[in-house]
Amino acid sequence: MCLLSMRFTVAILLVLLSHCGGSHATSCTPGQPFPVPSYPESSLQETFEHIFETASGYFENESFQATNVAIEVTSSRETLWSFYHAAKNQSSQDGSTVIGKDTVFRVARVSKLLTAIAVLQLHDQGHVSSLYDPINDYIPDLEPSSVQWDRVTIWDLLNNVAGILDMCSYTLFDKRLNTNSDFTIDGYADIYMDFSARQKADLNLPPVSDAILEVMPACQVDKSIPCDSAGLLSWLRSSKAVFNPHQVNSNSNVGFSLLGILIERISGVKYEQFIHQTIIEPLQLNSTSFRPPHKDSGAVLQNDHTWSWDVGVNNPSVGLYSTPCDISTLLRWTLNKSPSSILNWFAPGFYAVGSHSLIGMPWNIFRTTTPLSIPNRPTTFNTVVGTLGPYTSVVVVMPEYDLAVSLMMNGALGHPHDILTNVTFPLIRAADKIALESVQDNYAGTYKAEPGQKINSSITLSVSSDHGLRISELISNGSSILPVMERLASSKSGGGANWIFQAVPTFLDSKHQGRRGDGVIVDEEWRWTYVLDKPPGEGWNDWCLSSFDPVTYAGEPLTKMVFHKDAKSGRVLSVALSGYNITLTKAVQEADSFAQGDALDLLAHAGQEVLAE
């Protein structure tokens, strides 16, 4: 029996809706309209066959004859798919001529992922009091300097907004190999050191004085000398700022080298040892290290001095060696567990260049509606990408879909954009289809009050590709509620009559034992919001305000829905509407013939627990 009156008058609804945020255009539809999907065996098989065919054709191009490639796709549970391409020109190789899951690559800036994890774990454990602490609190020997180190925070370094130089002590070009080459060197840091005499002459740069050369770190001049923290800090004390701190995103490998020094100062052990003890060993990344393995196990080009180059203090930004298998293991960990119990480390921290790019710790985040071709459904790709000499590595994490991709290449690289598009876009489309089908199978349908409740109330939920789960009909005590809400919302917004009431999961789940002890119920909380069906891209229609808790009724949130699921089977049994103080049972034919008597007994207790919250 309902404890509170279900008779909402137009006047009451008008008062409630007057407290809501402004109208939301369709382009402001909430993201992730579904729980994190799972991928039963063979569910993505057709998609992977298509991706394999595309990738095979792409790397058959003559320009990739000396290129080795490894691509893996993983969920939080297991590796789902892999693609390996060995260089057809075997004479170009000085290492393994067979590429597989255990082939070692230099993974360049993917090293930053481990550094960021380590810093966030130290913060989580209380060894770093605040991510907004100035870095010179931990590394006072950065001063004296013209850089305002007392304004550069740990957070700035993690997000690449410290405003400091990008690279120091990088000499990626070996003059012995390219004395007459054109400008084809990837990853150079200093033209004076990295370019041949001919290349420098073509740029018509002025001569460099001996006084300037004398203050440069020895490892900047001689690649065979590993750079150390003392040399880096000395160089930074004489460096100039690129921007003021926390103003502009500009990549800084030096920033992550400083984070490596921070880890050493806090832990009392070398950076490499700390990463091995806290990340590599616990995750059993058995082929991951900061030292090159024997060439026979690696993807190594002939005359490639980058393979064995000891980058020293730059290990936290570019020094790691790893395999496709180990990186997939690391990515599974990132999907399953955050290094911080406080922060959502997938969330952006600052703007980046362009309208679709953001940055995080240490992510380059790409957010676009292109994969799904639905204007109001953006996909978010959390990436780390980098090049070191002939090596390019990319990781792409899609937490909404419980998927991650790794790409490792060496040789004639080309740009990774094309292959990333050919892998991730079909993958996202297939994963989105699986996720929405799961919502359709598990949540869509009509939920009704039981005869014993003596009230004519129900809710009908449907699924669409652009809005996910939405309320199609809401009946309270015999009255249709949605038309009233639509009219009042339209009146408040000043125009527009086509309102969509969309539900999204909050991931605030709990479990309890059924009353008779014969089943465990999962209480899965969702919230719904209202979206005005206006096209995106027109004027200010893309300006979005968000609130999933805009109104309450007698202290209960009107927009809260709690689905009750049988923990063993995963079947949705009922939904509790908190504001209406009622639990509605899923129609028997839509509940997969779950034993109705047992379900109702469990649901009665579940509803009482929800109302008691």
From Swiss-Prot:
Residues 1-25 form the signal peptide. This is Probable hydrolase clz13. The lineage of its organism: Eukaryota, Fungi, Dikarya, Ascomycota, Pezizomycotina. InterPro entries: Beta-lactam-related (IPR001466), Beta-lactam/transpept-like (IPR012338), Beta-lactamase-like_AB/R (IPR051478). GO terms for molecular function: hydrolase activity. Its EC number is 3.5.-.-. Probable hydrolase; part of the gene cluster that mediates the biosynthesis of squalestatin S1 (SQS1, also known as zaragozic acid A), a heavily oxidized fungal polyketide that offers potent cholesterol lowering activity by targeting squalene synthase (SS). SQS1 is composed of a 2,8-dioxobicyclic[3.2.1]octane-3,4,5-tricarboxyclic acid core that is connected to two lipophilic polyketide arms. It comes from Cochliobolus lunatus. Glycans are attached at residues 61, 89, 286, 422, 456, 477, 581. It holds the Pfam family Beta-lactamase. The keyword Signal applies. Belongs to the beta-lactamase family. Keywords: Glycoprotein, Hydrolase, Signal. Pathway: Secondary metabolite biosynthesis.
